[in-house]
A protein has these predicted regions:
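Charged, alpha-helix-forming regions
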Residues: 1-180
Length: 180
């Protein structure tokens, strides 16, 4: 698949939040994205938008959140918010999820990357296929993601049901009556 590539900084706002981890509240109203896969809660929000959220430290290239709505953001977590109508945010999320870690590792001096900065993120190049193609790709990947999620939640329940069924039939098959 060919197409034009642009720097992320040319089509997106890249910035961080202002929150600290201790700003999290147990019963908060808004998601609070910090530098981990686990999303915390906060009573206040900083942004109301569609964005991709990645840690600036720890889990770099492994942790990606896509979010649409009101949210709070940690001071070392980056938000990537498209400002160009030429790019679908969910398409960008999938593209970054598949390619960003390799990009970061190529830029790094060592095999591990402990932190990234805004200029590094802004130089990441992304393709800009036609919006219809982006929507088609998102639709396909959304279906695969839903299927994967269903399997991850449904499979343990199915395994447990089969285990119980096995135990039932095993006990039935191995129960004998004494005859005189």
């Amino acid at each position: 698949m060919g197409g034009k590539f642009v720097r992320l900084g040319d089509v997106c706002i890249v910035g961080t939040g202002s929150g600290n981890r201790q700003d999290a509240t147990e019963d908060g109203k808004y998601p609070f994205f910090v530098r981990s896969k686990k999303v915390l809660l906060n009573d206040n929000y900083e942004f109301d938008e569609e964005a991709i959220l990645i840690p600036g430290e720890g889990g770099i290239g492994d942790i990606f959140h896509y979010y649409k709505g009101k949210y709070a953001l940690h001071q070392r977590t980056y938000r990537i918010h498209p400002i160009s109508d030429a790019i679908n945010t969910k398409f960008l999320y999938y593209y970054m999820f598949a390619n960003f870690k390799k990009f970061i590792l190529m830029k790094a001096v060592s095999a591990t990357v402990t932190s990234i900065r805004k200029p590094m993120i802004e130089t990441f190049e992304v393709p800009i296929p036609p919006l219809e193609e982006q929507a088609r790709i998102v639709s396909i990947l959304d279906r695969f993601e839903a299927l994967t999620t269903d399997l991850q939640t449904g499979l343990p329940a199915e395994i447990e049901a089969r285990r119980q069924q096995y135990e039932y039939y095993r006990n039935k098959l191995l129960t004998f009556k004494h005859t005189a």
